[in-house]
Amino acid sequence: MNTEKLQKAREFEQEQMKKISSEERPFYHVTGSVGWINDPNGFSYYKDEYHLFYQYHPYSNQWGPMHWGHLTSKDFISWKRLPVIMAPEESYDNAGCFSGSAIEMEDGRHLLMYTGVGIVKGAGVNENGDPVTHQTQCMAVGDGTDYVKYEKNPVITGNDVPEGGSKVDFRDPKIWKEEDGFYYSVITNMTEDGNSRILLYRSKDGFKWEYVTVIDHSDEKLGKMWECPDFYEVDGKQILVVSPMAMLPEGLKFHVGHSVIYLTGSYDKTTHTFVREDVQPLDSGIDFYAPQSMLTPDGRRVMIAWMQAWPNSKFVPDGVKFFGQMTVPREINYRNGKLIQQPVRELENYRGERVLHENVEITEETTLEGIRGRVLDMTVKLNVTDELKSFTIKAAADEKYASFISYDAKKEVLTIDRSRSGYLYDILHSRDIQVSPVDGKVTLRILMDRFSMEIFINDGSQTATMVIFTPQEADEITFQAEGKAEISIEKYDLIF
């Protein structure tokens, strides 16, 4: 049903999209139709297509009252833009339709579950001068194009939060269905002492929900508010993914501020007990937040994330007509105690001619025939020997601009550095990552698009993601070593 606010957003979106050329967008990373985007939402399979919704403020390239944007794809790579599907207009979501998820119902409808942020009438303003709001969980149903909010929203309110929890910070439902016939949802909730916990709810019909238990909690460790939870099993291991705010650093494992971590363990579906065994970073780069996953019809767990970070997102480059993009969708597996991430295999269908260099000795800055470009899929295998001190890849480069991927062989530290990439703000521009060789090698699969680099380290056992704003003419790639390096390179331009 096209309400007045929704219709206004759709008309604005269609008009402003005409002002953005394809040359201004990345080739294969999702962007919003116009305006601002952040968290991926409603990542699901419905009517023979993959659906991706997203947090969306169409009216500017800054964060604002959240709508839901919408795209579909047959292969995770080429996406079709559909009209915005939700606008903040009801009493329970007039301050924003916040993040949520989606699932197909048995009757064929597409069910969306999201957080409504509503202004509390008569409550005045908070310490920041903003209206006092509360967060509740809401439903909408649709046919893949148009969606209608459930007439009895909200379906879970602050009254359904167990003792000790906040009614203000209660959001980001992730829905799925179990073999027992129930829909389940994990929802994050801040506790009165400023920590976070992940609550589990269930419903027989998708609309009437009951509280079940606490899945896990931060307990004054691993940050404060755990945003955007995801909960699933992969390769026999139960995974809880959260995006903590106010994270404290721990060596090179966890970095300060907003992060994404995954907790591994076991889960008893009868007692709904999750026993945590380990905690690891999900991505160790600069720009990665709020991932959401889905299960494909062929049984793959596929994840996508907002390719940005909240501290950096406040600094929007001058002249851009939209802001925010998503990572390439990643296949997730569990092996040797870690989540393994790789770009979805469908990306290989877009590869052009193969360029191969094997066992190349590098001692000084070197260019190699056929190795340059900005839209590519390149794997570099570095032999780590006693003769190697450090090795550097310089990409998206010319005389003025460059981004760097460097490896210190003695410290076993990989560094990504975009300080010369053209992102001209005093924000985080580099990150150090502990990376040990595997069988004497460090392997880097590098995905480049017009405005980003995604690095899959040692067959995806670690990843590092960063956004760059470098003129497209800067397309040189060079290799340099201190000491002596031996590398092999396989590179494909990506053709669209």
Regions found by a protein language model. Name each.
Residues 10-16, 264-496:
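Beta-rich accessory regions
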